[in-house]
Amino acid sequence: MGGASIWHWIVVGVIVMLLFGRGKVSELMGDVAKGIKAFKKGMADEDQPQAPVVAAPPVTATEPVRTLPPHPTEPAPATHATVDRKVV
């Protein structure tokens, strides 16, 4: 019961063919092959040294830098008075 015999795999294969059809299974296997090929290509590209990245030259300012006016240290005076009211 613990091992999968050849008959188990044949039954599984027949069920898969009935559920998905022959066309879907062949498409799936083709997609798996493309994925493996892309993975191998990516691994091969990783081993090759890459060209060094050239940094862009620094940009020089043509206009002087504008600064903001100094922040006031005192708060602005209140424009309206607050009144305590009791709700009746």
Curated annotation (Swiss-Prot):
Main location: membrane
Disulfide bonds: none
Cell membrane as UniProt keyword: yes
UniProt entry keywords in alphabetical sequence: Cell inner membrane, Cell membrane, Membrane, Protein transport, Translocation, Transmembrane, Transmembrane helix, Transport
Ranges annotated as spanning the membrane: 1-21
Gene Ontology CC terms, in alphabetical order: TAT protein transport complex
InterPro entries, per the entry: TatA/B/E, TatA/E
Annotated spans, Disordered: 62-88
Keyword Iron part of the UniProt annotation: no
Taxonomy, superkingdom: Bacteria
Membrane topology qualifier: Single-pass membrane protein
GO molecular function: protein transmembrane transporter activity
Subcellular location, record wording: Cell inner membrane
GO biological process per UniProt: protein transport by the Tat complex
Functional description taken from the UniProt entry: Part of the twin-arginine translocation (Tat) system that transports large folded proteins containing a characteristic twin-arginine motif in their signal peptide across membranes. TatA could form the protein-conducting channel of the Tat system.
Family: Belongs to the TatA/E family.
Subunit annotation: The Tat system comprises two distinct complexes: a TatABC complex, containing multiple copies of TatA, TatB and TatC subunits, and a separate TatA complex, containing only TatA subunits. Substrates initially bind to the TatABC complex, which probably triggers association of the separate TatA complex to form the active translocon.
Protein name: Sec-independent protein translocase protein TatA
Species in which this protein is naturally found: Methylobacterium sp. (strain 4-46)
Protein encoded by which gene: tatA
